[in-house]
Design a protein with these regions (language model features):
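Active-site proximal loops enriched in glycine and acidic residues that flank catalytic Cys/His/Asp
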Residues: 34, 155, 185-189
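Generic, well-ordered alpha-helical scaffold segments in large soluble proteins
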Residues: 42-46, 150, 154-158, 190
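Glycine-rich beta-alpha loop elements in corrinoid/cobalamin-binding modules
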Residues: 1-129, 136-137
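Conserved active-site and cofactor/substrate-binding residues in soluble primary-metabolism enzymes
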Residues: 16-17, 37, 142, 146, ...
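A glycine-rich phosphate-binding loop feature that marks nucleotide/adenosyl-phosphate handling sites
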Residues: 68-76, 167-176
Length: 190
């Protein structure tokens, strides 16, 4: 869900454009897309930080300073932490304006984001919200076939989480949508 809310996004519940969830949350880093490579690289960087600390742990402040991991977003208020090749999106203030210009800015932002989804040619994206910047690193590279095959060969149970065994308010258990995809084949990810 964070992937869909990493930049300014339309919120159906409030019927407004909301700012990045990373700016509203207490998270240090947001990971988006297919995260296998990203999480391994991020874990290695955290492990390296922890190795040099007195207590063997990485602090939240140290983790929040990690940069350059594909498939992640971070926030900063320092312009010098923005990659030099970054593309600036229209700001949150522009895209959230409830005007014709605001809607055009939102559409422009979407087009820029959509044209930067290729892991080979994508550039970092930056969205300003007041004095802070959301920086989106380029997407993670796809897994090589051997690694992808290992992921697909994991012992998935095709079962819902045990918490859904408890009857809901309507007396039913399970996840009805699971029936539709129970015997589906993976043709793409994302």
């Amino acid at each position: 869900e964070a992937s869909l809310r990493r930049t300014s996004h339309y919120d159906y519940w409030s019927n407004t454009v909301r700012r990045s969830i990373l700016l509203d949350s207490k998270a240090d880093i947001l990971m988006y897309g297919m995260g296998e490579n990203s999480i391994l690289e991020l874990a290695a960087k955290i492990k390296e930080i922890a190795k040099h600390s007195e207590d063997g742990f990485a602090t939240s402040k140290e983790v929040a300073k990690i940069r350059g991991v594909r498939g992640t977003c971070y926030r900063t208020s320092k312009k010098e932490e923005i990659p030099s090749d970054a593309i600036f999106l229209p700001s949150y203030q522009e895209v959230s304006a409830n005007t014709k210009e605001g809607k055009i800015a939102f559409a422009k932002s979407y087009i820029i984001q959509e044209s930067n989804t290729d892991s080979i040619s994508a550039k970092p994206l930056v969205e300003q919200t007041e004095e802070r910047f959301l920086v989106q690193e380029p997407p993670s590279h796809p897994l090589p076939q051997e690694q992808y095959d290992k992921v697909m060969e994991l012992p998935y149970t095709r079962r819902w989480h045990p918490m859904y065994d408890k009857p809901a308010a309507n007396g039913k258990t399970g996840v009805p949508a699971l029936e539709e995809v129970l015997f589906s084949l993976t043709s793409c990810r994302g």
